[in-house]
Curated annotation (Swiss-Prot):
GO cellular component: cytoplasm
Keywords (A to Z) from UniProt: ATP-binding, Ligase, Nucleotide-binding, Purine biosynthesis
Catalytic activity as recorded in UniProt: 5-amino-1-(5-phospho-D-ribosyl)imidazole-4-carboxylate + L-aspartate + ATP = (2S)-2-[5-amino-1-(5-phospho-beta-D-ribosyl)imidazole-4-carboxamido]succinate + ADP + phosphate + 2 H(+)
Identification of the protein by name: Phosphoribosylaminoimidazole-succinocarboxamide synthase
SUPFAM superfamilies: SAICAR synthase-like
EC number: 6.3.2.6
Protein family (similarity comment): Belongs to the SAICAR synthetase family.
Pfam short name (any one): SAICAR_synt
Pathway(s) annotated for this protein in UniProt: Purine metabolism; IMP biosynthesis via de novo pathway; 5-amino-1-(5-phospho-D-ribosyl)imidazole-4-carboxamide from 5-amino-1-(5-phospho-D-ribosyl)imidazole-4-carboxylate: step 1/2
Amino acid sequence: MTRKLEIPESRDLPDWSHIGGGKVRELYVHRQYKNILLMFASNRVSAFDFVLEPEIPEKGRMLTQMSNWWFRKLPAENHLLENYDQELYRDLASHIPSHILERSTICRKMDIIPFEFVIRGYLTGSAWADYLENNTVYGIKLKGKFRQGDRLPGPIFTPTTKSRTKDTPVRYEDLVNAIGLSHAQQLREMCTDYYTTAEQIARNKGLIIADAKFEFGIAEGKAYLADELLTADSARYWDINSWGQFDLPIERRLDSFDKQAVRDWVKCNSGKNITPQNITPLRLPQELIQTVYKKYKTLLAKLTG
């Protein structure tokens, strides 16, 4: 079955050339300023590296607002053009229709480091599965006994490959071999600092960031935060009050403001193996679409309100 991808009409972006896209975003380069990119966030939703249907209403706009909010909150150099040349940013933005601009990020072109950098502050997801099986979190031995959802003694840095299909964990030693010791150390420190700062900001908003993915680009020999930042697609958020109520069932304590409900539904409806043949025919029920939409909307309001 062929899926029709949501891509802005060329007449709406006459100054930009479409150069590719991923599971959620479409990428454009400016026809005159070849070092300026536009990332358009679609309403598509993916799980286990597959795009599903139907789309989540307003998802692209909400993700863009979350990401831009965090880019402005964190004391970190990033890829946003407005931080580099406000006059050029305002000029380019003024020629983009509002319904596209609200879902777009205008940024500097950079050499993206081909890894994703995940910081885990709480024992959940694949970290919890690893702990149950090996009593470690990605090779790190934990002292004492931990429950699902417990806060870890300190943030754990777990890089992965950056792939169009399935991302796989990367040992720190292999990361060092790929990008060099100094760069690996710098990125680990940056990710840990950004996560720690963001987690405190989120706590003040009544939220916990259980884990988060960061991506970086290189320009003029420096590393900058790139792609999306701490959105509902790239970070796992919990309600801080629910997390602290240990008498609640675990699914309520750790109910997250993201697409975990989609992942759970796919697991239940794709048979024993999650494969393209099993996932492609699936259509998400409207009740689930509305549930995820409300989660994104609630998270955005909690963060920015």
